[in-house]
Amino acid sequence: FKSIHRLNFEKYIKYKFDIVINCSMPSKRFWAKKNPKKDYIETVEKTSFFLKNYKFKKFIHISSVSARCEKNTVYGKNKKNSEILVKNNNNKNLIIRLGPMFGRSLKKGVLIDMINSKTVYINGKSKYSFTNIKWIANWIIQNMKNKKGLLEIGSKDYIKLVSIRDKIKSKSKFIGRLDNQIIINKEKYKISSNEVYRFLKGKLSEKTN
């Protein structure tokens, strides 16, 4: 196992890997909108660099459902273009699209905004397939050798943001466009978006203590 980051990535050029997992792409949609050139470099050009300079049997590319549902945005376009590079590189490669996630390390995003009763700059009727990041990590570990192609993994269902706000009695207001982040896959996973409520309960408890 090798941990590759900004300070050592050049060290592993031509190194022979069995599997390379690329989770280096930016995940900030609003940042991408304000910094389109930087997002292109960090998403498309960086993926191209790894594909051209690293030796591997299989490349696992961690992408986003935005490549499907936000094709007209900078973020979505760049994610889609990076996927095309991976697909054309090797038919054994695996592209994993993720949706909204939650976990102990979460510090920003719509869930944190609602916990703190801040304005959420998305339409409240937006549907999100929230998924526990631990489940995602375990799925990748268990399936990285036998899966290939393009898969969206995550919760089998979704929750409207306004429903979460009302459930936790947040005072958040919603401003913005409809932004559905739903997992679409032939296989329906057992994990449910409703697990997010346990996470929110814990966060709210921490806030009051």
Which stretches of residues belong to each language-model region?
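A short beta-strand-loop structural module common to alpha/beta enzyme folds
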Residues: 1-13, 174-177
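Active-site beta-alpha turn of Rossmann-fold NAD(P)-dependent dehydrogenases/reductases
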Residues: 24, 60-64, 97-99, 154
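Conserved Rossmann-fold NAD(P)-dependent oxidoreductase catalytic core, especially the SDR/UDP-sugar
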Residues: 48-76, 94
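NAD(P)-dependent short-chain dehydrogenase/reductase
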Residues: 84-135
